[in-house]
Amino acid sequence: MAQLSRRHAIAGLAAAAAASATRSRSVKAAEPVTVWWTQGFYEAENKAVIDKLAAWEKATGTKVNLTIMNGPDLITKLIAAMQVGDVPDLVHSVTGDRFLVPRAAWDDQLVDVTDVIDTQKSEFHPTAMLGSRFYNAKLKKHAFYTVPIKCSTLMEQVWRPLIEEAGFTDADMPKTHDAYFDFFQIVHDKLRAKGKRIYGLGYSMAAKEADSGTLFHHFLVAYGGKDIVLPSGKLNLDDAVVQKATVTALERLTTPYKKGYVPPGAINWGDVDNNNAFFAKQIVMTPNATISIAVAQMEKADQYYKQIITQGIPLGNDGKPVPGILAVAPCLIPKGAKNIDAAKDLLRSFIKPDNLNQYLKETRGRFLPVMMSNIKSDPYWQDPSDPHRHIAVETGLTKPTIPWWMNYNPAYSAVLSEQIWSQAEANITQKNITPEQAAEEAVGRIKTIFERFKIA
């Protein structure tokens, strides 16, 4: 996933319409709404939110001050803002569900938005709902502290011309987990035999940002580790099945790297770098958190429709479906916001099914809807002539999914922030310790973290 560095701001469009009868009764036009929004991978994503907020601004007469910034910067600045008490009214953070919200909710730093959720409660995907509930240690209960806007799960992106150059077709790609990823090592060997300096696997393996952790945890689930944290919030790392899954996931991700099937630089990749390596045809395939790779090439018809393959999560080695981990990109309202009523009014408008669907379509469908009615009523999402979107919808919305584990216990947000599993991979690839040793060290650190987060 890529983040850019530009900022946008929209000014008021309809000050003269402040007395409009269409203004929401809960909004005071004299009070502007300050919004921070995560920057998109391409300009269409930024334009989509600018247009939506401008329309709400015009309808209500309430000025919106919008700042669009890259994801990591947004989280860093919001944490600092919450510490000094000078916060925006509304925030959309693509990775906030993992790296920000769980501990902010724990510390009672977010506004409960259950009343906003309730306006569309029957519309939301069940896993998206689970992914929006977090535990408040002060109140000793779970509540909705975010409003789901869009979601995603891991996808596989493959260059068809490269597998064909190696002598294979789409039908040759195996369906089960280990066989699937091993296939690209075979493709790698065949391309190298032809003198091509191309890597079979584009694994993100850096101890930073989000993609590496996403990849590890999908491998963890594929090997039976989905119960690493129980719904009660209890850490379950002493379970034999989970223990084995952690070791196997580490071994299966690091061994291809050590054998040269993954680019050496992958240990330093940020979230954009696997995309760039794919576009440069340095790698045959890469797991990616959205279909951003394909969507970014939409204007290049041959690449979008013929050359880039989007595939869902492989079956488990037992031939059974592996649940996807559904990441929910949320909106939230920090405590201390100056215009909470207007922020909630804006959110209620934004998540009306037709509004939310139109926004996601204007972003080119990089992320999935969080409302099942959108995919059922709008053929855009399951159009069989599009080789990417309907695969993403099937993987993330119609097949089994699970929430991230920080929805059960915010301690797991700290696990992700500290990059514990990615650091374990680095210890294997760079310090030559065994997967068993790396897993043992990681488990010890995780247990220490969980001691700080007791669910009542």
Identify the residue ranges that each predicted region occupies.
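Conserved C-terminal helix/tail region of periplasmic/extracytoplasmic solute-binding proteins
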Residues: 31-33, 63-64, 164, 189, ...
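N-terminal export signals
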Residues: 2, 8-27
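C-terminal lobe and pocket-closing loops
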Residues: 291-304, 317-419
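Extracytoplasmic "Venus flytrap"/periplasmic binding protein-like
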Residues: 51-131, 164-167, 172-175, 276-277, ...
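Hinge/lid segment of periplasmic solute-binding proteins
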Residues: 95-155, 212-215, 309-313, 383, ...
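Short, solvent-exposed loop/beta-turn-alpha elements that line the ligand-binding surface or hinge
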Residues: 112-127, 173, 192-193, 203-206, ...
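Glycine-centered hinge/linker elements that transmit conformational signals in sensory
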Residues: 182-188, 230-267, 309, 313
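Extracytoplasmic/periplasmic solute-binding protein
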Residues: 136-149, 154, 181-235, 283
